């Protein structure tokens, strides 16, 4: 399964799209669609600026790694809406945290509702709780046909 166009749009809306480096809510230098140095090149530093095309290329590379992490950890069948929500969660908390998350354990055990509830455990800083709620809602709500 891949990130759907709806999932990609939701993820970009949640992360934002900025062409100049900025500090995120916890002080990490970030650029593009939530790209940090921890995700790989480019290294983000004060004053860094990128073009829209560079932003798109960085996002494509970054999101592919998070899609792969979700595919690797997810053993339960889920719909596109749920897969997209998990990619968004993984993109924000990182592949290692996602792999060890209660949310993933519950989902893989067949407890989708419990998995959605466990997504809300990832609520630090507090400003991220709104995002977690929308991810959990996306996880349990199939896309309209």
Give each language-model segment a name.
Residues 1-28, 35-40, 44, 50-68, ...:
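Long, amphipathic alpha-helical surface segments
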């Amino acid at each position: 399964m891949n990130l759907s166009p709806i999932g990609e749009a939701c993820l970009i809306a949640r992360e934002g799209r900025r062409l100049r480096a900025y500090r995120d809510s916890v002080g990490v230098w970030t650029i593009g669609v939530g790209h940090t140095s921890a995700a790989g090149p480019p290294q983000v530093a004060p004053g860094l600026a990128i073009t829209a095309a560079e932003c798109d290329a960085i996002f494509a590379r970054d999101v592919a790694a998070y899609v792969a992490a979700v595919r690797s950890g997810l053993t339960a069948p889920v719909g596109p809406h749920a897969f997209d929500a998990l990619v968004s969660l993984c993109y924000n908390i990182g592949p290692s945290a996602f792999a060890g998350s209660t949310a993933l354990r519950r989902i893989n055990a067949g407890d989708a509702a419990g998995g959605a509830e466990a997504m809300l455990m990832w609520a630090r800083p507090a400003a991220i709780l709104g995002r977690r709620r929308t991810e959990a809602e996306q996880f349990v709500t199939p896309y309209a046909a």
